[in-house]
């Protein structure tokens, strides 16, 4: 069932941020001890309505700056209960620690970390409503948590160009670039390099892409830049076989079939990762997702353009 994007829109501009997020950390256990996971918090800490926005494989939590602002502003402008938006840097990315054992960069650790963060937030302020927006990897984490009987259940799940099946061709492509963090003289150089492997994100102006790239790099001691994440993320990906990928897909379908909350699948019409047939199957079993298809976009929509933001707002019952 497609979603309409008709109606007035929030007037958000990339270069006019309403406010800055608060950076915080939570300690998460792993087999070697503990690591800190960073998360970016938007909105009032007292808000009982929390939206998690979780990024893709080599991305980080600041990808959601515009969406987070739109969520907070939409509720406030409409006189609805305040919303707090939580955008984690999954371990090994952004401001989070790197794991001692790179084989830990897999979904069981990611989901466990999110459960720890969720428990910490719920202790600070009881969460009455939890929604989840997950791009690619972040969507898989969302499926894992949505299928569980958590003390704070996910009430609305948005999967951004991800489902149980992931094409083997896409995985082979990941094997070629994940871990190649590069070395760049300027942020613009890094942005240009990232664009070469990210054109499937859909049309973006040079200004929009540079804004998305600012938090994708870290500055080295010699003044140059590299991508923000641990290069060892490549270890479990390069070790993955096609047979293991097929077994993982079967397991994810079993998990998807357990999801009972309202679910929206946002799919790039040109996505090579998630086929139209797979998206159709997701409407017929398990969570029986609604589907919003974005023309001219592949994997994965950035959720920075107003039409994409409006789809999220509408599904969550917020005015666009």
Feature-to-residue mapping (PLM):
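Alpha/beta-hydrolase fold catalytic core
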Residues: 1-52, 73-83, 307, 313-320
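Active-site loop/oxyanion-hole signature of alpha/beta-hydrolase fold enzymes
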Residues: 31-33, 66, 72, 81-133, ...
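The conserved beta1-alpha1 loop
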Residues: 52-56, 267
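The serine-hydrolase catalytic nucleophile loop
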Residues: 57-69
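Conserved hydrolase catalytic core segment
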Residues: 127-168
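Conserved alpha/beta-hydrolase catalytic His-Asp/Glu region
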Residues: 185-239
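Conserved serine/cysteine hydrolase catalytic core
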Residues: 218-284
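Catalytic histidine-centered segment of alpha/beta-hydrolase-like enzymes
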Residues: 297-307
């Amino acid at each position: 069932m497609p979603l309409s994007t008709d109606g007035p829109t929030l007037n958000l501009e990339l270069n006019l941020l309403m406010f800055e997020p608060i950076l915080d950390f939570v300690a998460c256990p792993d087999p070697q001890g503990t690591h800190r996971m960073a998360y970016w918090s938007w909105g009032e800490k007292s808000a009982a309505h929390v939206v998690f926005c979780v990024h893709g494989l080599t991305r980080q939590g600041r990808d959601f700056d515009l969406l987070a602002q739109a969520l907070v502003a939409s509720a406030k402008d409409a006189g609805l209960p305040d919303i707090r938006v939580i955008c984690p840097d999954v371990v090994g990315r952004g401001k989070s620690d790197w794991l001692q054992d790179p084989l830990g960069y897999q979904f069981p650790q990611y989901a466990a970390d999110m459960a720890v963060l969720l428990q910490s937030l719920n202790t600070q302020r009881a969460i009455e409503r939890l929604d989840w927006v997950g791009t690619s990897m972040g969507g898989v984490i969302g499926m894992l948590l949505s299928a569980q009987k958590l003390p704070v259940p996910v009430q609305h799940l948005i999967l951004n160009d991800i489902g149980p099946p992931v094409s083997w061709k896409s995985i082979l492509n990941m094997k070629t670039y994940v871990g190649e963090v590069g070395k760049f003289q300027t942020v613009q150089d890094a942005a240009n390099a990232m664009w070469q492997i990210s054109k499937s994100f859909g049309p973006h102006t040079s200004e929009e892409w540079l804004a998305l790239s600012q938090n994708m790099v870290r500055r080295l001691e010699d003044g140059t830049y590299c991508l923000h994440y641990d290069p060892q993320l490549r270890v479990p990906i390069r070790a993955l076989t096609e047979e293991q990928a097929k077994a993982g897909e079967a397991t994810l379908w079993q998990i998807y079939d357990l999801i009972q909350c309202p679910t929206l699948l946002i799919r790039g019409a040109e996505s090579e990762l998630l086929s139209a047939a797979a998206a159709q199957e997701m409407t017929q079993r398990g969570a029986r997702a609604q589907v919003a298809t974005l023309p001219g976009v592949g994997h994965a929509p950035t959720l920075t353009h107003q039409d994409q933001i409006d789809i999220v707002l509408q599904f969550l019952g917020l005015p666009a």
